[in-house]
Each structure stands twice: as structure tokens, then as C-alpha cells.
């Protein structure tokens, strides 16, 4: 599969806010930093799609925003899977693919 480099921007600061949003991703996992919103489960999306799926699946788990690696309470974290998915073998993108 080809890997288009058109994913949503992912914050790299130590305290990354994970919230829901209406943004769309071409590939990877979307970690928007727009608050306050309901926190959603994250889901990897596929590349090479002219009509990309939403970054999240509608399964609200926490009613408020929270910061990772912060000293603030983060209720409901045990219900959120933050596994990162990678694609080690990606073919170069071509116009017909992406």
C-alpha cells in the first residue's frame, strides 16, 4: 500500500491533549488538540483514500479533556487504548493511488 503523507498533525509536546474533533486523516492516528471536547477512542485510518474516514470512532469514554503525562487526574484512562500503529513497508505514492 502507498503511504500518503497527508495525515493529521500530531502534537509532539510532552503533554499531548487527545480530544474529539471533526478533522479527517489520510493515514495514521489523529490526535487533535482542540478542547474542550469529549475524548474518543482512537483508530488508525488507511491511506490512499480520496474520501478519508474520520479520525475516531464514536465511542465517548471520558466527558472532559485531559493531558497525558500531567499531574491532573485522568479518569477513565483504563478504557482507552493508546496503541500506536505503524506501516513498515510502504510503496511510493503515485497520483492514481493517492
From Swiss-Prot:
| Metal-binding among keywords | no
Q: Tell me where on the tree of life, at the top rank, the source sits.
A: Eukaryota
The tissues in which it is expressed are: Wool.
Residues recorded with modification N-acetylalanine? 1
**Which GO terms label this protein's molecular function in UniProt?**
structural molecule activity
Annotated keywords: Acetylation, Keratin
**UniProt cross-references to InterPro entries, sorted A to Z:** Keratin_matx
- Pfam families per the record? Keratin_matx (PF04579)
What function does the entry list?
A: In the wool cortex, wool keratin intermediate filaments are embedded in an interfilamentous matrix, consisting of hair keratin-associated proteins (KRTAP), which are essential for the formation of a rigid and resistant wool shaft through their extensive disulfide bond cross-linking with abundant cysteine residues of wool keratins. The matrix proteins include the high-sulfur and high-glycine-tyrosine keratins.
Family note: Belongs to the KRTAP type 3 family.
Q: Subunit notes for this chain?
A: Interacts with wool keratins.
Name the UniProt record assigns to this protein: Keratin, high sulfur matrix protein, IIIB4
Amino acid at each position: 500500500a502507498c503511504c500518503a503523507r497527508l495525515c493529521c498533525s500530531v502534537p509532539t509536546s510532552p503533554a499531548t491533549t487527545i480530544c474529539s474533533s471533526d478533522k479527517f486523516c489520510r493515514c495514521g492516528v489523529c490526535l487533535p488538540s482542540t478542547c474542550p471536547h469529549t475524548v474518543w477512542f482512537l483508530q488508525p485510518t488507511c491511506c490512499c483514500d480520496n474520501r478519508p474516514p474520520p479520525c475516531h470512532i464514536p465511542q465517548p469514554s471520558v466527558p472532559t479533556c485531559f493531558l497525558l503525562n500531567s499531574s491532573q487526574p485522568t479518569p477513565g484512562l483504563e478504557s482507552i487504548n493508546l496503541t500506536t500503529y505503524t506501516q513498515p513497508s510502504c510503496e511510493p505514492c503515485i497520483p492514481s493511488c493517492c
